[in-house]
Regions:
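Conserved phosphate- and dinucleotide-binding cores of soluble alpha/beta proteins
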Residues: 1-99, 106-193
Length: 193
């Protein structure tokens, strides 16, 4: 059964990277060496004989709203950014920085916002599970260069911003299957923070 959600424009095609590893014993490593690597196709190919139905919908994705940042979450973000800056100065993180893997929610938004505001931290890439609201703004500001994830968990206004400026975002966001976004081999290879 295929769902065709007409609320999502066809112009979003190209943001996806569908990769299916080979079966053992010939399976190789997942060939992601930087977050922006595209290793698969932008769609799933299915034998037409296997399709039993197409369900048409026209429903935008619904994402619960996060509370606004408060003094505590802002301070957590500032502390994490200051810690990572100190680690760079001490040489434990390269001067070019490393990709970020963030969680989702207010604290993750606070940390990402603080990283974006800290001018001692260079523009960075993300290899994460969830791409959320703060990432959209940081991309527009040039602070996040690229984000790889398995979902866009953004509010309606941010999703509309992505859709309205798809030519800008299509080359800066890739959506992958969860087994690729959360793969420990890839996370270790990239040196995710």
């Amino acid at each position: 059964i295929i769902e065709l959600n007409e609320a999502m424009p066809a112009t979003m095609r190209g943001m996806h990277d569908i990769y299916e590893p080979a079966d053992p014993p010939v399976r190789r490593e997942i060939p992601v060496y930087k977050p922006s690597d595209r290793i698969g196709t932008d769609c799933i190919k299915v034998e037409p004989s296997k399709i039993v139905a197409v369900v048409k919908t026209n429903r935008p994705n619904e994402v619960g709203k996060f509370s606004p940042l408060d003094e505590t979450t802002a301070k957590i973000g500032e502390n994490v950014a200051a810690f990572l800056e100190a680690e760079m100065k001490a040489g434990r993180i390269p001067a070019s920085f490393l990709p970020i893997q963030s969680g989702v929610g207010n604290i993750a938004n606070a940390v990402l916002g603080a990283l974006g505001e800290n001018q001692h931290i260079p523009p960075f890439e993300m290899y994460t599970e969830v791409i959320q609201d703060s990432v959209v703004g940081l991309m527009k500001e040039g602070r996040v260069k690229f984000a790889s994830g398995c979902s866009l968990t953004v509010g309606a206004d941010k999703l509309q911003d992505i859709i309205d400026h798809i030519d800008f975002f299509r080359d800066k966001i890739v959506l992958r299957p969860q087994e690729i976004s959360n793969n420990p081999e890839v996370a270790r290879r990239l040196g995710l923070i």
